[in-house]
Amino acid sequence: MEYLPLFADLRRRPVLVVGGGEVAARKIQLLMRAGAQIIVAARALCPALEEIRQAGGLSWLGESFEPAMLDDVFLVIAATDDAALNARVSQCAEQRHLLANVVDDQPYCSFIFPSIIDRAPIVVAISSSGTAPVLARILREKLESILPTFLGPMAAIAGAWRGRVKQRIRSMAGRRRFWEKALNGRFASLMAQGRLEQAEQALEQALNAGPEHGGEVALVGAGPGDSGLLTLRGLQLMQQADVVLYDYLVSPEVLELVRRDAERICAGKRVGEHSMPQQEINRLLVTLAQQGKKVVRLKGGDPFIFGRGGEELQAVATAGIPFQVVSGITAAAGATAYAGIPLTHREHAQSITFITGHLRDGADALDWQALARGRQTLAIYMGVVKAAEISSQLIRHGRSAQTPVAVISRGTCSDQYVQTGTLEALDQLAQKAPTPALVVIGEVVALHHEINWFGQQNLAAQKRASVVNLA
């Protein structure tokens, strides 16, 4: 993050604008909306600024910039067509530790103006850090079409009710749940219809009904790593959570999407290394929910595919706590897709089998005879530790030693690492594989060299297109 987003209170604060042309006028009109006390340093004013001056909207010094003009001002904006003068304004501001903006000359700016969506008191600011202003404008236009016009009045009413809600609901978590329900329920629906009086009545009724004290648990699949693969429902629950218990397999990019003030607890597991025993995780889920909290159990991939999600929900259900499950893209689907390996193919594989290489009791309970049959794909989770045994057993039971295999490390992440080879060399590949890693066995692996795409093309352009097309 190159620039820290800040919202400045400019009401009755002096702001110096150097320049009296149309560019300065556009900045001044924006400053006026924020209530700034505007001072203009320029020998002449364009018609638009002269009109504002006559209406009492600005003070005009009527002379060229002098450093002394920076005394006792809050911000300074240079908006002239004289590059040397603009640079001088910036340098003088820097010497006085004042924030300065030089229009269309980012190197001389200590702050920049974002693209703005105004639904006052809701304001959305979008910035490309000065690198792609056209992209920022396109994003603003897209969001303008998505964000409803009633957001401003709804926020104003919510602000007027904050004091009453705080008096009636003492806990911060309780107040947050009240507002989440109101802003996603009847109150918001009435606001959308323009029925302001009825909307306030709905707030009154909700407040009189009292806060909801019951906690709940949401078991959410975080997907294989790329935050773009997270489901919308999962994101919504992560943004509403009071506390999030997450595993090591959840990527930092996904964790970054958790609500900022939610408590985060690492309940991670790696092979041979458990930061928290499974029974303790089960107990903690129940305890936190019984405290009235919204708990998200965030697990890599899909929580019901080798994620012990079923075990955890058994404990939650036994305690009588409400719960829900949000599926995630499992690693076998996500990692292979990003590696250009289709799990099934009419010419190579008519079935796919998911296998765990880490059995609960450590015993060999796999049907190797069935797994060694051809024309199927094997996706083995946590298989690198037992790669030698897997290779040996499959070959012993009839699978060709030349069967193509892949070991995919950090699948779907920017540092994804794919190794390919044959079944007889699986152990050597596994020894070089960073974890977490997925083992894929089958003829479909050979297609990796034809249709591998991730990291091979201009992904920056692809991702930008997906962001721009929000609607």
Swiss-Prot record:
InterPro entries for the chain: 4pyrrol_Mease (IPR000878), 4pyrrol_Methylase_sf (IPR035996), 4pyrrole_Mease_sub1 (IPR014777), 4pyrrole_Mease_sub2 (IPR014776), CobA/CysG_C (IPR006366), NAD(P)-bd_dom_sf (IPR036291), Siro_Cobalamin_biosynth (IPR050161), Sirohaem_synt_dimer_dom_sf (IPR037115)
Keywords of the record: Cobalamin biosynthesis, Lyase, Methyltransferase, Multifunctional enzyme, NAD, Oxidoreductase, Phosphoprotein, Porphyrin biosynthesis, S-adenosyl-L-methionine, Transferase
Positions of the UniProt region annotated as Precorrin-2 dehydrogenase /sirohydrochlorin ferrochelatase: 1-203
Source organism, top-level taxon: Bacteria
Residues engaged in binding S-adenosyl-L-methionine: P224, G300, G301, D302, I305, T330, A331, M382, G411
Catalytic-site annotation from UniProt: D247, K269
Pathway stated in the Swiss-Prot or TrEMBL entry: Cofactor biosynthesis; adenosylcobalamin biosynthesis; precorrin-2 from uroporphyrinogen III: step 1/1; Cofactor biosynthesis; adenosylcobalamin biosynthesis; sirohydrochlorin from precorrin-2: step 1/1; Porphyrin-containing compound metabolism; siroheme biosynthesis; precorrin-2 from uroporphyrinogen III: step 1/1; Porphyrin-containing compound metabolism; siroheme biosynthesis; siroheme from sirohydrochlorin: step 1/1
One MF term in the entry's GO annotations: uroporphyrin-III C-methyltransferase activity
Annotated region (Uroporphyrinogen-III C-methyltransferase), positions in chain: 215-471
Phosphoserine PTM sites in chain numbering: S128
EC number, as in UniProt: 2.1.1.107, 1.3.1.76, 4.99.1.4
A GO BP entry: siroheme biosynthetic process
Catalytic activity, reaction form: uroporphyrinogen III + 2 S-adenosyl-L-methionine = precorrin-2 + 2 S-adenosyl-L-homocysteine + H(+); precorrin-2 + NAD(+) = sirohydrochlorin + NADH + 2 H(+); siroheme + 2 H(+) = sirohydrochlorin + Fe(2+)
Residues reported to bind NAD(+): E22, V23, R43, A44
SUPFAM superfamilies in the record: NAD(P)-binding Rossmann-fold domains, Siroheme synthase middle domains-like, Tetrapyrrole methylase
Function: Then it catalyzes the NAD-dependent ring dehydrogenation of precorrin-2 to yield sirohydrochlorin. Finally, it catalyzes the ferrochelation of sirohydrochlorin to yield siroheme.
UniProt cross-references to NCBIfam families, sorted A to Z: cobA_cysG_Cterm, cysG_Nterm, PRK06136.1, PRK10637.1
Protein family according to the UniProt entry: In the N-terminal section; belongs to the precorrin-2 dehydrogenase / sirohydrochlorin ferrochelatase family. In the C-terminal section; belongs to the precorrin methyltransferase family.
Protein name as annotated: Siroheme synthase
